[in-house]
């Protein structure tokens, strides 16, 4: 997963070298989400039919091809190709790798181990790229060469993994899994989906355009700082997800929305004050809110969905989440062409605050109404 966020601190260098603006940066980033969504819809259950290891090997091969596109430095076409391949790989990894971790981890620790591997990888990508780009030669080459080395290690480890699935015989046809949200799930799915959309929009902001904020608004040209800020968002999300069990999904979901509201208000304030400290504080607060909202939304939707429709319902939730990580940041890029990146960031922060506030308030009212109904029935 580190490869999917590896280019984050490097977008400014690509912008200088290829001569495109912030809008194109966000479009290049958003292509990744298209790849993830396509992979989830087309191949989300392939590891159940083919086995975990074949799908993991395919994802590793796609990741290597993505790194190769960036290494060739062939301009925008290869940047788009690299991001699309990276999205395909992430879509395959999200299902097969998560399942393997859940199946092989010690009892009771699988959920946290899967979350830690996912968020840890996403966070380490920009941190590694930022450090190498800032303090080592060939900033647009070395990060992806290092990624290929890590992929070789991952390939060797995957060879050593036991297969945890016995593919059915005869092998069933490989068809797109599609999406389906049953009628009885929709009252839970709609607010949960909006919370996921909002939380992943925060991820999109930090992974696509926060390096532009750091260099253009805060006037900090150190790429390692940009990478560390994105790293902090994903680490904070991991903390938020680990806290969800303590509160329970009905409380954690509106609490996550509150974290998103406070975090994005801090991000907006950091742009007004040109303050790195306030930006980092907003990144951590928003990351915790995202983690709480996402994990509790996934728990609530999974618990409500009938078993025969659970896979399609969860796929639909992930599609909503990845639309959130892509569409809003393209809007930020478009706004930045006329308003400038600082003002576009302020508009984005305000929109997230309004949406998260509305969703959180509705969730809290629903929870209180359900509690009152239970008390009356008792």
Identify the function of each model-found stretch.
Residues 142-158, 345-362:
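Symmetry-related core transmembrane helices of the 12-TM Major Facilitator Superfamily/SLC fold
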Residues 252-295:
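C-terminal transmembrane helical hairpin of 12-TM major facilitator-type secondary transporters
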Residues 82-118:
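Cytoplasmic helix-loop-helix junction between adjacent transmembrane helices
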Residues 225-249, 259, 263:
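Transmembrane alpha-helices of Major Facilitator/SLC transporters
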Residues 296-349:
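A late C-terminal transmembrane helix in Major Facilitator Superfamily
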Residues 107, 112-159:
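Helix-loop-helix hairpin linking two adjacent transmembrane segments in secondary transporters
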Residues 37-76:
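Conserved MFS/SLC helix-loop-helix module at the cytosolic interface between two early adjacent transmembrane helices
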Residues 19, 51, 72-77, 137, ...:
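Helix-breaking motifs and short loop linkers at transmembrane-helix boundaries and internal kinks
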């Amino acid at each position: 997963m580190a490869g999917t966020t590896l280019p984050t601190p490097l977008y400014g260098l690509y912008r200088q070298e290829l001569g495109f603006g912030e809008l194109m940066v966000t479009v290049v980033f958003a292509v990744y989400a298209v790849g993830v969504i396509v992979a989830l819809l087309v191949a989300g259950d392939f590891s159940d039919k083919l086995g975990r290891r074949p799908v993991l090997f395919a994802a590793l091969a796609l990741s290597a091809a993505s790194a190769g596109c960036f290494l060739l430095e062939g301009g925008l076409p290869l940047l788009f190709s690299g991001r699309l391949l990276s999205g395909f790989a992430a879509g395959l990894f999200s299902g097969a790798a998560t399942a393997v971790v859940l199946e092989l981890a010690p009892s009771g620790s699988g959920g946290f181990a899967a979350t830690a591997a996912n968020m840890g990888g996403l966070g380490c990508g920009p941190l590694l790229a930022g450090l190498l780009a800032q303090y080592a030669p060939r900033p647009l080459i070395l990060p992806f060469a290092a990624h290929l080395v890590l992929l070789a290690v991952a390939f060797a480890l995957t060879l050593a993994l036991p297969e945890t699935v016995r593919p059915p015989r005869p092998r069933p046809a490989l068809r797109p899994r599609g999406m389906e949200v049953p009628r009885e799930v929709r009252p839970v799915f709609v607010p949960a989906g909006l919370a996921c959309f909002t939380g992943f929009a925060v991820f999109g902001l930090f992974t696509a355009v926060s390096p532009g904020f750091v260099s253009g608004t805060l006037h900090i040209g150190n790429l390692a700082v940009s990478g560390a800020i994105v790293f902090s968002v994903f680490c904070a999300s991991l903390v938020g997800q680990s806290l969800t069990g303590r509160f329970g999904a009905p409380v954690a979901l509106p609490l996550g929305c509150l974290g998103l509201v406070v975090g994005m208000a801090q991000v907006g304030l950091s742009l007004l004050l040109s303050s790195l400290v306030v930006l980092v504080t907003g990144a951590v607060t928003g990351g915790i809110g995202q983690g709480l909202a996402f994990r509790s939304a996934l728990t609530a939707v999974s618990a409500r969905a009938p078993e025969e429709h659970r896979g399609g319902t969860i796929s639909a939730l992930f599609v909503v989440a990845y639309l959130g990580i892509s569409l809003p940041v393209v809007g930020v890029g478009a706004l930045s062409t006329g308003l400038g990146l600082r003002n576009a960031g302020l508009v984005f922060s305000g929109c997230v605050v309004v949406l998260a506030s509305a969703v959180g308030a509705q969730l809290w009212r629903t929870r209180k109404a359900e509690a009152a109904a239970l008390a009356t029935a008792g």
